Amino acid sequence: MSEPELVRLAKQGDIKAFCAVYDQYKSKLYSYAYYKLGNTQDAEDAVQACALTAFEEISKLKKPEAFCSWIFRILYCCCAAAIKRQIKQRNTYNIEDYKNIPADDNESIIIREDIKRALSKLSDEEKSIVLLSVTAGLKSKEIAKVTGLSAGNVRQKLSRSLAKMKKELT
């Protein structure tokens, strides 16, 4: 069954259809949230909040074909709320938070830490655009829907952000 068909069924209250379409995005949602928030617990909480909100609000989704950008918009908002909580709580990121992320070897851990360091040099908006592109695989048009920017602005910011990261990583 195609994604739009599953979404149509989910809009009618079919829980299995919702789970099937949600499961297609779960790992990408988690990757985005993890790199955006910096630790496993907050990422898991944001993805869970996103799933709950998406399930409760799916009947309001006008275009089943837009499910991808719609669910990432929900996660984008969940992550923004989590960041506000982090600021209030003055959370500090600890290397222990990264031990639960599977890695093939020590080199993978080093590379992941280098990427996190490079991402930390970007503004929240730049980081979101890069993560939506790289971890979620969204196109400029879809990122524009999630962030509220124009597709041209997204392409420009993505290019500049990737250049900043490249400079940081070399």
Task: Annotate each language-model stretch with its function.
Residues 59-63, 73-93:
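Arg/Lys-rich amphipathic alpha helix in sigma70-family domain 2
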Residues 81, 89-112, 116-117:
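Internal acidic/polar
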Residues 24-27, 35-38, 131-138:
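Short helix-capping/turn signature of helix-turn-helix
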Residues 11-12, 49-66, 85-86, 168:
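Sigma70-family region 2
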Residues 7-31, 121, 127:
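A short, charge-rich alpha-helical start-of-domain segment used by transcription regulators
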Residues 19, 47, 144:
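The alpha-helix within a helix-turn-helix
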Residues 80, 126, 135, 141, ...:
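DNA-recognition helix of helix-turn-helix
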Residues 31, 45-52, 56, 65-77:
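Structural recognition of an alpha-helix C-terminal capping motif at a helix-to-coil junction
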